[in-house]
Amino acid sequence: MAARMCCQLDPSQDVLCLRPVGAESRGRPFSGPLGPLSPPSPSLVPADHGAHLSLRGLPVCAFSSAGPCALRFTSARCMATTVNAPRSLPTVLHKRTLGLPAMSTTGIETYFKDCVFKDWEESGEETRLKVFVLGGCRHKLVCSPAPCNFFTSA
C-alpha cells in the first residue's frame, strides 16, 4: 500500500511541506537549515537517519547507511518513477537495500530534489502543488508527528 501526499513549496521560507491527501491531519512543514524542524521520535529514527541533509519528507531509510527500502517516488504529473528514472537509479536503490556500495546519499538526495522541484521551475506553476506516491516502505517520515501515519506498511 502507498500513501498519497500533497507536496507544496512555501517560497517565503524555502520549506517543503508534505501533507496526506484528504486526511484530517494538516501535517507539519519540514525544513532543513532554512526553517524550523520538528524533533523526530527516537523510536522511529535510527542514529544515522541523515538529519544533516536538507531534504525532508522521505522516510528515514532513504538516507540510512544501511540503504533505503525499495522506494517508488512518483509524481502524479510527470510520473518520475524508478521505472523511467535515470537508468542507474533502480540498481543503486537495490544495491543500497542490500547494503552494497552504491551512489552516495548526496546523489540520491539530488535525484529526489530534482523530481520535486524540476517541474515547478520549468513550468512556473503558481500553485506549486503536486501529489506524490511513496510505496513499498515500512518506515515513517523523518519528522512525522506521532499521531500522523503518512506511510503505510509494505
Curated annotation (Swiss-Prot):
It is found in: Host cytoplasm; Host nucleus; Host mitochondrion. Its main location: host cell. GO terms for biological process: DNA-templated transcription; symbiont-mediated activation of host NF-kappaB cascade; symbiont-mediated arrest of host cell cycle during G2/M transition; viral genome replication. GO terms for cellular component: host cell mitochondrion; host cell nucleus. Belongs to the orthohepadnavirus protein X family. Multifunctional protein that plays a role in silencing host antiviral defenses and promoting viral transcription. Does not seem to be essential for HBV infection. May be directly involved in development of cirrhosis and liver cancer (hepatocellular carcinoma). Most of cytosolic activities involve modulation of cytosolic calcium. The effect on apoptosis is controversial depending on the cell types in which the studies have been conducted. May induce apoptosis by localizing in mitochondria and causing loss of mitochondrial membrane potential. This is Protein X.
